[in-house]
Amino acid sequence: MDGTTAPVTKSGAAKLVKRNFLEALKSNDFGKLKAILIQRQIDVDTVFEVEDENMVLASYKQGYWLPSYKLKSSWATGLHLSVLFGHVECLLVLLDHNATINCRPNGKTPLHVACEMANVDCVKILCDRGAKLNCYSLSGHTALHFCTTPSSILCAKQLVWRGANVNMKTNNQDEETPLHTAAHFGLSELVAFYVEHGAIVDSVNAHMETPLAIAAYWALRFKEQEYSTEHHLVCRMLLDYKAEVNARDDDFKSPLHKAAWNCDHVLMHMMLEAGAEANLMDINGCAAIQYVLKVTSVRPAAQPEICYQLLLNHGAARIYPPQFHKVIQACHSCPKAIEVVVNAYEHIRWNTKWRRAIPDDDLEKYWDFYHSLFTVCCNSPRTLMHLSRCAIRRTLHNRCHRAIPLLSLPLSLKKYLLLEPEGIIY
């Protein structure tokens, strides 16, 4: 037995070839890869199990549950791995040996992976070799739906130029078009490109949401509590493309409701100027002003006083007076917002609920304001100047924002009529 080696079994030899094949793919050793395929030591469509913690290679049906350890690896062919690593030479070798170009061992074709990796060279090669442009992944997405980053815009353009359907909806419970996806991720260049190539601006998903509504909702980065200028630009573009500003989803929410939920005064101004109706109600009977009221306390980056001012100047119905304590509950740390709302009434009288709604530290911090609030909101009528303001605003109603700036009045009076906060009530 000494000096001899154990014979290599057939299964052992197959494992060795498979390992060499995988190493050649990873190192982009296309010469070695070609030699293995010429010798027919392994099938060109051999499936490997590889690490894939970010699920670039995998795609699963919505609603399916898998344990976490199952999601850390995926099945993939040599084509998928070549695209994943960006190894164009290996990709060409495999295609020259008739690799199955639309294979989906773990739910995605190589073209899906190429778009997710934003590798435009691989996209071009796969398209040239006959990859199906509108093929669904197991999760119901086409290649265009995987173009979700600025670096993948060129991939999307290649697909559309070669005939990909810009209005094809996902084959899942969301039913979103590529335009919805571009709006979701704030890709203004891609939004413009899709519309120029026939995308329906007011296409709706399964929840009856338009791309404008999607962009308005995702304009707030919830984790960072920051507003996205990219999404603002997308909304501006969609409105310029004549998107319906008062479109309603299946909960009767308009894009203005979405912007109000984010307390996003930039988008609210944009939509109101484009003709959004300030008093549209959702399925629960809430208008945009109620949405702002609900979220004011949890939007640290917001300027709620501007949101209220915009809505009231565009004819929004005022908060029901007996519920005014809820305004104070939501805005106790933002006196300017309370000032804007309270000045929309000819007169309103305070009650004990108002005082209970103000934390002691905020009462002390903003004492001058709250002292003026309780002094003015008593049994005595407001000043003649305030009552004149209310009369003018009542006459102009939803034209306040447009008509008041045109009046022959000093700027300070125009600001007063438009409910510009001053930090104190008189």
From Swiss-Prot:
Swiss-Prot/TrEMBL domain comment: The SOCS box domain mediates the interaction with the Elongin BC complex, an adapter module in different E3 ubiquitin-protein ligase complexes.
Domain SOCS box, first and last residues per copy: 371-423
Q: What is this protein called?
A: Ankyrin repeat and SOCS box protein 4
Which family does this protein fall into? Belongs to the ankyrin SOCS box (ASB) family.
The protein's job, in short, is: Probable substrate-recognition component of a SCF-like ECS (Elongin-Cullin-SOCS-box protein) E3 ubiquitin-protein ligase complex which mediates the ubiquitination and subsequent proteasomal degradation of target proteins. Promotes differentiation and maturation of the vascular lineage by an oxygen-dependent mechanism. Also acts as a negative regulator of GPS1, a component of the COP9 signalosome (CSN) multiprotein complex, thereby inhibiting the serine phosphorylation of IRS1.
Stretch list, region Essential for interaction with HIF1AN: 238-239, 244-246
Query: From what organism does this protein derive?
Result: Homo sapiens
Q: Name one GO cellular component term.
A: cytosol
- Kindly state which keywords UniProt assigns to this record, in alphabetical order: ANK repeat, Cytoplasm, Hydroxylation, Repeat, Ubl conjugation pathway
- What is this organism's lineage? Eukaryota, Metazoa, Chordata, Craniata, Vertebrata
GO process annotations (BP): intracellular signal transduction; positive regulation of vasculogenesis; protein autoubiquitination
The encoding gene is ASB4
Pathway it works in: Protein modification; protein ubiquitination
Q: How is it modified after translation?
A: Hydroxylation at Asn-246 by HIF1AN may provide an oxygen-dependent regulation mechanism for the function of ASB4 in promoting vascular differentiation.
In chain numbering, the residues marked as site (Essential for interaction with HIF1AN) are L256
- Assembly, per entry: Interacts with HIF1AN. Component of an ECS (Elongin BC-CUL2/5-SOCS-box protein) E3 ubiquitin-protein ligase complex formed of CUL2 or CUL5, Elongin BC (ELOB and ELOC), RBX1 and ASB4. Interacts with IRS4. Interacts with ID2.
